[in-house]
Amino acid sequence: MITFSSLLVTFSAISTSLAIPGSILPKRSPMNFVLQRNESSLVRRATPNYEQDYTTGGDVIYTPSGSSFTVDWSTEDDFVVGLGWTTGSTNPINFSGTFGIGSGTALLSIYGWSENPLVEYYIVEDSASPPSFGTVKGSVTSDGSSYTIWENQRVNEPSIVGTATFNQYISVRSSPRKSGTVTVENHFQAWAALGMNLGTLNYQVLAVEGWGGEGAATQTVS
């Protein structure tokens, strides 16, 4: 789980358009992965049953319960929390709830990693004061909106395999939302069509990430 280090900028215009229809996919299994970050740690738990509250520069209170979680924060530090699956898939992800930002930068996204190649990926559904996401590669239309596709390289940064150099693949929705269905397969196919290939999927979560501000979110995931 890596934060973006670039200065905050306005999203660039879309350069390429790819439209991929949704497909009927099997339902997902129950949640079996809880993600929290305190400074640079990646923490995995088989059962979503814990609370995070750290005060280095501020407060983050994270409370998962079954397939739902709440998070309240007021901090200058980075945090990332999420709920999902130990192994990602192309199955659709349903999410519903709230995402309110008083100040600072925050993202509500589908978030995960792949290995071989090592890739960190985001499907950003809502955001506040978003940073630059790298280089615009194209776009994809899915779930009632266009998404700008970005690619970014991280050099000697923390990852799920330790300090490494890896790419980030990022889809950013043009009409933000706090609830809906994300057809993950559409994004994976659009990335692949642009030469942005994923490897073996590692964990995959609905994540709230924030830094330098305050806000609150409540989400249910399936």
From Swiss-Prot:
Entries under Gene3D superfamilies matching the protein: 2.60.120.180
- Keywords for this protein: Carbohydrate metabolism, Glycoprotein, Glycosidase, Hydrolase, Polysaccharide degradation, Signal, Xylan degradation
Query: What enzyme category does the UniProt record give?
Result: hydrolase
Residues that carry a glycan? 38, 94
Q: Please report which protein family the annotation says this sequence is part of.
A: Belongs to the glycosyl hydrolase 11 (cellulase G) family.
Q: Does the keyword Hydrolase apply?
A: yes
GO process terms (BP): xylan catabolic process
Q: Which ranges carry the GH11 domain? A: 36-222
Q: What is this protein called?
A: Ethylene-inducing xylanase 2
Q: Cite the EC number.
A: 3.2.1.8
Gene for this chain? EIX2
The active site lies at: 120, 209
